Structure formats: C-alpha cells, structure tokens
Amino acid sequence: MSDFTAQTTTEPREYDAGFGDYFALLKPRVMSLVVFTALVGILVAPGGVSPMIGFTAILFIALGAGASGALNMWYDADIDAVMKRTAKRPVPAGKVPAGEALTLGLWLSAISVAMLGLATNWVAAGLLAFTIFFYAVVYSMWLKRATPWNIVIGGAAGSFPPMIGWAAVTGDVSLASVLMFGIIFMWTPPHFWALALFLKKDYNNAGVPMLTVTHGRTETRRQILIYTILLVPVALGLVLTEVAGPVYLITALVCNAIFLKGAYDIWKRDEAMAEADGYAVEKKVFKFSLLYLFLHFGALLLDAIWRLI
C-alpha cells in the first residue's frame, strides 16, 4: 500500500472519476451478497420488524459493507494494480485518488454504524462496527499479506451480515444466527481456494500468500475437500432451529451433495489433468459455490414465507 500511495502523492495525476467509479469502490457485487443475507436474517428473526425499520437496517448494513470495500481498495491498491482480476478497480486504474477512497470509507463507516444504532439497536451497530474493523484492519492490513490462512480467519468479516440483520430485529444473538454465520464462514475457504487454483500466478505476482502459493495446489485441493466436509454439518444443523423448514432441508441436502461431489472431483485431480482442460472443474465448482449461498439463504426466505401462509 505504501509504494502505491507514495506514487500517487509524488506524481500529479489527472483523475476522471464518475459516479460509477465511486460506486465501484463499494464493491457492489460483494454488497449484493451482504444485503441478501442480512435481509434474510431480518426476515427470519422472531418478532418481526416494521418495513421502514427493516429497509433502514438494510440500507445502513449495505453502507457499512460499502465502507469496508472502499477501505480495502484504498489499502490494497498496490496489490490490485498487479492482479489482472483487480487492475481495473477505480484506485489502481487511476480513476479515484487513494485519499478519496480512504475518506469515503471512513465517513461511510461512521455514518452506517451510528445510524444503524439509532434506527435499530446498539447490538446490531456494534456487530457492524466490528465487521468493518475486522475486514478493513485485521484482514486487509494484516492477515491477507501475512498468512496463507488469511481467508479462513478473515472469512469471519463476510459472515456477520445475517447475524447483524437478526440482531437488528431481536437485539441479541441466537443459535440460528450463529449457524447462519457459520455457513458463510465455512463456505468461504473452499470458495476462494477454488478461485485461487486457477489464479495462482496472479496471487504469486502480487505477493499474496494464498494457500496455492505457499503450500501448492495439491494441498489446496485437499483443504478444499476438508472444509467442504466441515461445511455440511453446519449447513444441515440449521434444520434443528426454528428458522429452517422443508424447503431449506431439501435445498441443503441437494446443494451440499453437489458441493461435496465438486470438492471431491477437485481433490482427485492432478495438475496435468487441470491444465489439460483449463481448470474446467475448478471453475465449475467456483461458479456453483456462488450459487450455493444464495440457494441456502433463499430457501430460508421461502420457509419464512411458507410459515406466514
């Protein structure tokens, strides 16, 4: 981060940022998952909440997620500039000054936490504040560059939204919200390691110690299978709570069987096989992992609607 910042401060540049560039700082793709899982947390929580309070909670949870994204893009500008997948992001692409990304992230952090606390309760606001801190400071500034287990520990940051949504309604944390957290937490490693299998060169060039870089692809394949196996009981465990019904049970059984099969297929392959078909299996599993979370949380939403009928 320091090298990139030094470059941007010592060499005058012409910035040509539009609204879309500033919006991109908020990582809208990541935000969509945050909003959806937080919304499910709100809608399945007991007691219910008025539509206005629910909308307000989602708005400020989304802003908090966007704040995390902006702070991450500010700090990771040097890494993003090297990686093909991220080189076109607003800061490394020269669209938005790094200082503006930092300022935007800090302001949105303060506003989102304060307003969520005032609109709902300070338990939810405290969880949001911790999430922003964990992602921007613990993960982005430390774990990501320090350990191959960065996404295992750092995955906690992306796992909090349903718990925050739940707390916005109930003012507390329950087993159901912990299990919703756990699903995302255990899903994160196999999801990102599947990506890292076919983007190893990118991470290596950027100096990011992903597991594929430090331990090799063979060990990464083994860890994908291990974490996918560990994910299954967490996902199915939610059936034992009040929020999951028949739609979730069927969805979880089918999705986890597919994900397990994909993880097994990745594990049994060697590099010659993967290179021969352009990492087709790894890419297929990565794409399915994106669908996996939406299907699980969508099923919870359908069960909640079913109970109202």
From Swiss-Prot:
One of its GO terms (biological process) is heme O biosynthetic process. Pathway: Porphyrin-containing compound metabolism; heme O biosynthesis; heme O from protoheme: step 1/1. CDD domains: PT_UbiA_Cox10 (cd13957). Signal peptide: none annotated. It is a multi-pass membrane protein. Keywords: Cell inner membrane, Cell membrane, Heme biosynthesis, Membrane, Transferase, Transmembrane, Transmembrane helix. GO terms for molecular function: protoheme IX farnesyltransferase activity. It holds the Pfam family UbiA. Gene3D superfamilies: UbiA prenyltransferase (1.10.357.140). One of its GO terms (cellular component) is plasma membrane. Its main location: membrane. It is found in: Cell inner membrane. Interacts with CtaA. Converts heme B (protoheme IX) to heme O by substitution of the vinyl group on carbon 2 of heme B porphyrin ring with a hydroxyethyl farnesyl side group. This is Protoheme IX farnesyltransferase. The lineage of its organism: Bacteria, Pseudomonadati, Pseudomonadota, Alphaproteobacteria, Rhodobacterales.
